[in-house]
From Swiss-Prot:
Residues 29-259 form the Peptidase S1 domain. Induction: Dexamethasone (DEX) induces expression of isoform beta and represses expression of isoform alpha. The alteration in expression is mediated by binding of glucocorticoid receptor to independent promoters adjacent to the alternative first exons of isoform alpha and isoform beta. Keywords: Cytolysis, Disulfide bond, Glycoprotein, Hydrolase, Protease, Secreted, Serine protease, Signal, Zymogen. InterPro entries: Peptidase_S1_PA, Peptidase_S1_PA_chymotrypsin, Peptidase_S1A, Trypsin_dom, TRYPSIN_HIS, TRYPSIN_SER. PANTHER family: GRANZYME A (PTHR24271:SF69), KALLIKREIN-RELATED (PTHR24271). Disulfide bonds join 54-70, 148-218, 179-197, 208-234. The active site is at 69 (charge relay system), 114 (charge relay system), 212 (charge relay system). This is Granzyme A. It is an enzyme of class 3 (hydrolase). It holds the Pfam family Trypsin. GO terms for cellular component: cytoplasm; extracellular space; immunological synapse; nucleus. Belongs to the peptidase S1 family. Granzyme subfamily. SMART domains: Tryp_SPc.
Amino acid sequence: MRNSYRFLASSLSVVVSLLLIPEDVCEKIIGGNEVTPHSRPYMVLLSLDRKTICAGALIAKDWVLTAAHCNLNKRSQVILGAHSITREEPTKQIMLVKKEFPYPCYDPATREGDLKLLQLMEKAKINKYVTILHLPKKGDDVKPGTMCQVAGWGRTHNSASWSDTLREVNITIIDRKVCNDRNHYNFNPVIGMNMVCAGSLRGGRDSCNGDSGSPLLCEGVFRGVTSFGLENKCGDPRGPGVYILLSKKHLNWIIMTIKGAV
């Protein structure tokens, strides 16, 4: 599920201050196509319960990066090597989670830091169906106009259920000034420097409910994690998808968490 919500900023001064926070301070796919089976072997399907799914990326043999708002329970499954949700596939590796590590500065109200690491009970068997998606070497921002891709098993339109098969859509990074203007999010919520907006200004190309946690790849580099959008309005040009940027501080947290885990 890509989270969909609205939040009211108390004043313009608060909004401006949030936009200027330095980086060192603490969905089915809409408008896309089914991918060639197992052509995105880093994709992870998270079966949270019988009614809820998320996605993620395998970033080490026993580590998955997803969104913090994806709520797991003891029966939640981490499925590697999947193309279809329902079909039995010999490529699938089904695992359980040993421990969850939500980003310590995650704020559910603003969705800042909507990231979570999942340490798996066992290591994945790496093959042509299951591979690691490497983190970017630098936590650089992504320039407006950059072409990106996002994949997932989420909704294909707002009244649909999940897609049974993995789909992907091409989307474009949109300037934060545009995403925050009165014709788009209007600072509700604030799209800050540790987030990026991506979609189409004409609408119709987006991530959606069920795609939360999916990796955002821009020019082949892992740049963000699917977070939220307008409630029940996936693909609406007024609310492009919002992704948590893999900024320097987020990358440092990921690296230190993995190194420090037992």
